[in-house]
Swiss-Prot record:
<feature type="binding site">
    <location>
        <position position="147"/>
    </location>
    <ligand>
        <name>3-methyl-2-oxobutanoate</name>
    </ligand>
</feature>
<dbReference type="InterPro" id="IPR040442">
    <property type="entry name" value="Pyrv_kinase-like_dom_sf"/>
</dbReference>
<feature type="binding site">
    <location>
        <begin position="75"/>
        <end position="76"/>
    </location>
    <ligand>
        <name>3-methyl-2-oxobutanoate</name>
    </ligand>
</feature>
<protein>
    <recommendedName>
        <fullName>3-methyl-2-oxobutanoate hydroxymethyltransferase</fullName>
        <ecNumber>2.1.2.11</ecNumber>
    </recommendedName>
</protein>
<feature type="active site" description="Proton acceptor">
    <location>
        <position position="216"/>
    </location>
</feature>
<dbReference type="Pfam" id="PF02548">
    <property type="entry name" value="Pantoate_transf"/>
</dbReference>
<dbReference type="InterPro" id="IPR015813">
    <property type="entry name" value="Pyrv/PenolPyrv_kinase-like_dom"/>
</dbReference>
<comment type="subunit">
    <text>Homodecamer; pentamer of dimers.</text>
</comment>
<dbReference type="InterPro" id="IPR003700">
    <property type="entry name" value="Pantoate_hydroxy_MeTrfase"/>
</dbReference>
<keyword id="KW-0808">Transferase</keyword>
<keyword id="KW-0566">Pantothenate biosynthesis</keyword>
<feature type="binding site">
    <location>
        <position position="149"/>
    </location>
    <ligand>
        <name>Mg(2+)</name>
    </ligand>
</feature>
<dbReference type="GO" id="GO:0003864">
    <property type="term" value="F:3-methyl-2-oxobutanoate hydroxymethyltransferase activity"/>
</dbReference>
<feature type="binding site">
    <location>
        <position position="118"/>
    </location>
    <ligand>
        <name>3-methyl-2-oxobutanoate</name>
    </ligand>
</feature>
<dbReference type="GO" id="GO:0015940">
    <property type="term" value="P:pantothenate biosynthetic process"/>
</dbReference>
<dbReference type="GO" id="GO:0005737">
    <property type="term" value="C:cytoplasm"/>
</dbReference>
<feature type="binding site">
    <location>
        <position position="118"/>
    </location>
    <ligand>
        <name>Mg(2+)</name>
    </ligand>
</feature>
Length: 300
């Protein structure tokens, strides 16, 4: 059932005044800057971490004002903004341009969100040194953390970057940059062997120093197990159920700005909100209160 269908609509309307203690409010984005220690504090307190994509100054400022802790300048911009068939064609200079736009948007409103930027396809696999050069481009554009996709083979690169002062978010499960090798956008880790591999890769990435780990299109039970096994690396789920330390969605998807079939793991928060800000605030509250995602509707 599409996430925007009627049975899913009622719980995710305009945020109510009765947010849980410690939850972000619509003005939370103006608070103290989010940092890695702050994200660790949220997890230790049992509060979910919220992340959304943004590709320009205006949407970044809106997400920050609505209380989103982490903004991801994702290479999904290739499909969302550039009309590419996948993320494979996204270039490093494009990622730097959009990272700078988002950073300026946050600076303009004295925002507090933590800014993560994707290392695009072909910008880090050749060598650790190539990865560092690429990461420097994004960090100098305003990113505070870089994200890279891949399993155990990326662990040495993660360690190399972290040792040189570059915070890293890893990414397992469905890795869109490998869509051709994976044979399409399919759930990963469904078999016993696949689940064992993902568990092992997650441990290797934590040991290498990854501070965050995106788990995409992974069975909910497996994502929960991985999360419980990683005390020092905070999992961010997308299509991975409610048991991760946080959630991320593509902004355009959760606003209903999708011309194709809505992914199973998405809910259209705009349909019950009166504004973009209201939709994002509703997403933040639904995640914080544990109402989104609903494993029965949005997970495998």
């Amino acid at each position: 059932m599409p996430a925007s269908a009627a049975p899913c609509a009622a719980p995710y309307g305009t945020p109510s005044p009765a947010a849980p203690e410690g939850a972000h409010t619509a003005a939370a984005g103006r608070g103290a800057p989010v940092s890695l220690p702050r994200l660790a504090q949220l997890r230790a307190a049992g509060e979910k971490i919220t992340m959304l994509t943004a590709y320009d100054a205006t949407f970044a400022a809106l997400a920050d004002a609505a209380g989103v802790e982490c903004i991801l300048v994702g290479d999904s911009l290739g499909m969302v903004c550039q009309g590419l068939p996948s993320t494979v064609g996204v270039q490093l200079d494009t990622m730097a341009y959009h990272s700078a736009c988002v950073a300026r948007g946050l600076h303009r409103v004295q925002g507090s969100a933590w800014l993560v930027a994707d290392l695009p396809y072909g910008s880090y696999a050749e060598s650790r040194e190539q990865a560092l050069r690429s990461a420097c481009v994004l960090m100098q554009a305003g990113a505070q953390m870089v994200k890279l996709e891949g399993g155990g083979w990326t662990a040495p690169t993660v360690e190399f970057l972290v040792q040189r002062g570059v915070p890293v978010c890893a990414h397992l499960g469905l890795t869109p940059q490998s869509v051709h090798a994976l044979g399409g956008y399919r759930v990963q880790g469904k078999t016993d062997a696949g689940a064992r591999t993902l568990r092992q890769q997650a441990r290797e990435l934590q040991d290498a120093g990854a501070a965050l780990l995106v788990l995409e299109m992974v069975p909910a039970a497996l994502a929960r197990d991985i999360t419980d096994a990683l005390p020092h690396c905070h999992t961010i789920g997308i299509g991975a159920g409610n048991g991760t330390a946080g959630q991320v969605l593509v902004l355009h998807d959760m606003l209903g700005m999708n011309l194709g079939k809505m992914p199973r793991f998405v809910h259209n928060f705009m349909q019950d909100a009166g504004s973009v800000h209201g939709a994002i605030a509703a997403y933040v509250q639904a995640v914080k209160q544990g109402r989104f995602p609903d494993d029965a509707l949005h997970a495998w």
